[in-house]
Design a protein with these regions (language model features):
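Charged, low-complexity interaction regions
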Residues: 18, 76-80
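Short, hydrophobic/amphipathic alpha-helical patches that form generic packing surfaces
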Residues: 63-75
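Conserved short "hinge" loops at termini or chain/domain junctions
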Residues: 1-56, 103-139
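Structural motif
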Residues: 54-64
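Short, glycine/acidic-rich hinge or "gate" loops at secondary-structure transitions
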Residues: 43-46, 82-87
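Short secondary-structure subsegments characteristic of cysteine-rich extracellular domains
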Residues: 84-98
């Protein structure tokens, strides 16, 4: 998709007239959020005249970029209830992307720790009820 296409779809959904330069900013913010959450390095749009975006499939662009842009447009005009619906949809779709990120995001767009698994020690957080640390070994 191009910025012009994303702008047209988003304006149609929101019944607003956001400019392509504003939409480019919103799309880049969306891509940055995806990059942070997925440990990816998807490229940003550098101008409104950039060619068709190919780092994600058009399906993923439709379910991520469009709801996020619609959310941003509605936040800008103060329609908080509508904005909330769009951000909920974006978050649901982002969660799906994160579950399927190995097939959705190409290897050339992955950070070093893209598939890292972090282990935690759950015993370090026990400090409630019977397990309260009272200086007597937890008893």
């Amino acid at each position: 998709m191009t910025i012009n296409e994303i702008t047209a779809i988003s304006n149609s959904f929101t019944d607003e007239q956001a400019s392509t330069s504003v939409v480019r900013y919103y799309v880049n913010e969306c891509i940055s959020k995806v990059n942070i959450e997925a440990k990816a390095k998807l490229p940003l749009f550098s101008s409104i005249n950039d060619p068709t975006y190919t780092a994600l499939s058009e399906s993923w662009q439709n379910v991520l970029f469009v709801p996020y842009v619609c959310y941003s447009i509605k936040m800008n005009d103060g329609s908080l209830n509508e904005a909330d619906r769009y951000i909920t949809k974006f978050n649901e779709n982002l969660a799906k992307l994160l579950q399927e990120k190995n097939s959705a995001i190409g290897e050339s767009y992955r950070e070093e720790d893209f598939t890292a698994i972090y282990r935690t020690d759950p015993t370090m957080g026990i400090n409630v009820g019977w397990f309260t640390r009272r200086g007597n070994g937890g008893f």
